[in-house]
């Protein structure tokens, strides 16, 4: 079973220590009552991975680990088999001892769009909401973050993160917890909070923005990345049953509308830092994620539209400060 004791010890003497009033009981209840039916299979794959300590670790330009002398072909094959037991891999890519995990998303491209616009992460304590496999947590550590904490209720992603951590030498600077943002107390302890690819899945987007704000220290920075539509500050798309084949999409505002929402929630210095159309090069089917992807979600005759006839995915990055 995944143990969280190292994380508890890590936060016990710092600004996150009030979290210990609720977190251990939450995670104990999760382990007793909420495990996914496949969790034991996934965790078994993690347990059978070797504990490797790279001689070369690059978290600055990617997530890449090498060892000298290199691991054997047999070791690499065994490692690949265990990692494939954790498919589908959606967020990455990872390059581990000669094995490349080509994930559905080129999350490194998103990072390249975000990084130039945010405050330096060196020395910061960071929360990443909806962190997936934890790819961006490692990139945050690569930028010098003191501690990067990810939360995501999807248990496969937790196992993927623990697998990568094990192959990176058990690095304790990044941690993933199987929680949603609504399960966190108002910690007001993070220097930077990231919410990327989450807002459009929330039934109450303004509540989500308040939840993010409540995790930030005074003068802390929010990095918000989400789907948007073209339009003025009054423009919001409320899709019907599905958007790009996703059922749980509720509100897709324009970037100016999202800026207004952030200001309404009390954020200041709000700016639209980047906008980019999602391409089938950035999100696609791979050998590590073999089901349908963006190409199947777009109108085959007009890639400016989804199969439902809505505008194709356009993503914006907004930066804001908690006063």
Swiss-Prot record:
Carboxy-S-adenosyl-L-methionine binds at residues 91, 105, 110, 130, 181-182, 196, 200, 315. It catalyses: carboxy-S-adenosyl-L-methionine + 5-hydroxyuridine(34) in tRNA = 5-carboxymethoxyuridine(34) in tRNA + S-adenosyl-L-homocysteine + H(+). It holds the Pfam family Methyltransf_9. The keyword Transferase applies. One of its GO terms (molecular function) is transferase activity, transferring alkyl or aryl (other than methyl) groups. CDD domains: AdoMet_MTases (cd02440). GO terms for biological process: tRNA wobble uridine modification. Its EC number is 2.5.1.-. InterPro entries: CmoB, Mo5U34_MeTrfas-like, SAM-dependent_MTases_sf. Keywords: Transferase, tRNA processing. HAMAP family: tRNA_carboxymethyltr_CmoB. Catalyzes carboxymethyl transfer from carboxy-S-adenosyl-L-methionine (Cx-SAM) to 5-hydroxyuridine (ho5U) to form 5-carboxymethoxyuridine (cmo5U) at position 34 in tRNAs. Homotetramer. Belongs to the class I-like SAM-binding methyltransferase superfamily. CmoB family. This is tRNA U34 carboxymethyltransferase. The gene is cmoB.
């Amino acid at each position: 079973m995944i143990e969280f004791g190292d994380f508890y010890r890590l936060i016990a003497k710092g600004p996150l220590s009030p979290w210990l009033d609720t977190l251990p009981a939450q995670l104990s209840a999760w382990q007793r009552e909420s495990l996914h039916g496949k969790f034991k299979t996934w965790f078994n794959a993690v347990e059978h991975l070797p504990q490797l300590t790279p001689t070369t670790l690059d978290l600055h330009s990617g997530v890449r680990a090498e060892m000298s002398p290199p691991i054997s072909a047999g070791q690499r094959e065994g490692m690949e088999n265990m990692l494939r037991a954790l498919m589908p891999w959606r967020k990455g890519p990872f390059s581990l001892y000669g094995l490349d995990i080509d994930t559905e998303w080129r999350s490194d491209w998103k990072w390249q769009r975000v990084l130039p616009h945010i405050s330096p992460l060196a020395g910061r304590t960071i929360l990443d909401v909806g962190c997936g496999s934890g790819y961006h947590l490692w990139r945050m550590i690569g930028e010098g973050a003191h501690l990067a904490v990810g939360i995501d209720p999807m248990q496969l992603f937790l196992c993927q993160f623990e697998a990568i951590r094990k192959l990176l030498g058990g690095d304790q600077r990044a941690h993933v917890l199987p929680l949603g943002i609504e399960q966190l107390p108002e910690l007001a302890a993070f220097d930077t909070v990231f919410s990327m690819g989450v807002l459009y899945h929330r039934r109450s987007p303004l509540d989500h923005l308040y939840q993010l704000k409540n995790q930030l220290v005074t003068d802390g920075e929010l990095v918000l990345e989400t789907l948007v539509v073209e339009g003025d500050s009054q423009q919001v798309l409320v899709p019907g049953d599905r958007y790009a084949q996703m059922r749980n999409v509720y509100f897709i505002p324009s970037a100016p509308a999202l800026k207004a929402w952030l200001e309404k929630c009390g954020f200041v210095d709000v700016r639209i830092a980047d906008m980019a159309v999602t391409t089938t090069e950035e999100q696609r089917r791979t050998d590590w994620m073999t089901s349908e992807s963006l190409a199947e979600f777009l109108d085959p005759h007009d890639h400016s539209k989804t199969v439902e006839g809505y505008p194709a995915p356009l993503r914006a990055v907004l930066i804001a400060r908690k006063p």
